[in-house]
């Protein structure tokens, strides 16, 4: 009976370890893709805005556009916003 409990205990530990390993591998891959997307869109926005846009606003816009699609008009509108206007626009 004790070897049965020992085997069951080891099996449960292995299942828990496998579940944690699989859970941990999913998130970083998405974060890497999202970060790469934000960087590409931020660079494109910076060029489209002739390097005159507020960097925080452009970075936030890039992040939003990576999460859900946004139009070119929305992207270009971020060129003229400042950080304070962006925070009041969200309210």
Curated annotation (Swiss-Prot):
Cystine pairings recorded for this chain: 37-66, 49-79, 65-70
Keywords on record: Cleavage on pair of basic residues, Disulfide bond, Secreted, Signal
Protein name: Probable insulin-like peptide gamma-type 1
GO BP terms, alphabetized: innate immune response
GO cellular component, one term: extracellular region
Organism (species): Caenorhabditis elegans
Major subcellular site: secreted
Cellular localization per UniProt: Secreted
InterPro entries the record matches: Insulin-like_sf, Insulin_CS
SUPFAM superfamilies for this protein: Insulin-like (SSF56994)
Signal peptide: 1-26
Family statement: Belongs to the insulin family.
């Amino acid at each position: 009976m004790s070897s049965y409990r020992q085997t069951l205990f080891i099996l449960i530990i292995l299942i828990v370890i496998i579940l944690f390993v699989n859970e941990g591998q999913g998130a970083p891959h998405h974060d890497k893709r999202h970060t790469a997307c934000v960087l590409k869109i931020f660079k494109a926005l910076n060029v489209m805005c002739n390097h005159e846009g507020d960097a925080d606003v452009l970075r936030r816009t890039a992040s939003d556009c990576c999460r859900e699609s946004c139009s070119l008009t929305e992207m270009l509108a971020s060129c003229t916003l400042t950080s304070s206007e962006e925070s009041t626009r969200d309210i």
